[in-house]
Amino acid sequence: MRNYELMTVFPVEEDLYKPGIDALHSILADFGVQIKSEEPFGDRDLAYEIKKKTKGRYVLFNIEADPAKMIELDKRFKLITQMLTYLFVRLED
């Protein structure tokens, strides 16, 4: 298991944010990912338009995951239509 930071950006509209964050938690649980912390960063302007949105709700996760499952996890994240974008960063052990 390795430690990762996961930065996610969701639409600011509550009816899009809530299902998106629920889908994210469900996928992480399906893959046996342990969420060490979840820190909302709030709503911010995007540097450029993503999926016709100019504002996003940022949430930072510190997670522990199996590196062998990261490619499949990435593929599943792409199916979350409510999530604007995301980034995984592996942390030093």
From Swiss-Prot:
Assigned GO CC terms: ribonucleoprotein complex; ribosome
UniProt record, GO biological process: translation
Keywords of this entry: Ribonucleoprotein, Ribosomal protein, RNA-binding, rRNA-binding
GO terms of molecular function: rRNA binding; structural constituent of ribosome
Pfam families referenced in this protein's UniProt entry, alphabetically: Ribosomal_S6
Highest taxon of the lineage: Bacteria
InterPro entries reported for this sequence: Ribosomal_bS6, Ribosomal_bS6_CS, Ribosomal_bS6_sf, Ribosomal_S6_plastid/chlpt, Transl_elong_EF1B/ribsomal_bS6
Record keyword Signal present: no
Family indicated by similarity: Belongs to the bacterial ribosomal protein bS6 family.
NCBIfam families: S6 (TIGR00166)
Free-text function comment from the UniProt entry: Binds together with bS18 to 16S ribosomal RNA.
Record-given protein name: Small ribosomal subunit protein bS6
Upper taxonomic lineage: Bacteria, Pseudomonadati, Spirochaetota, Spirochaetia, Spirochaetales
Gene: rpsF
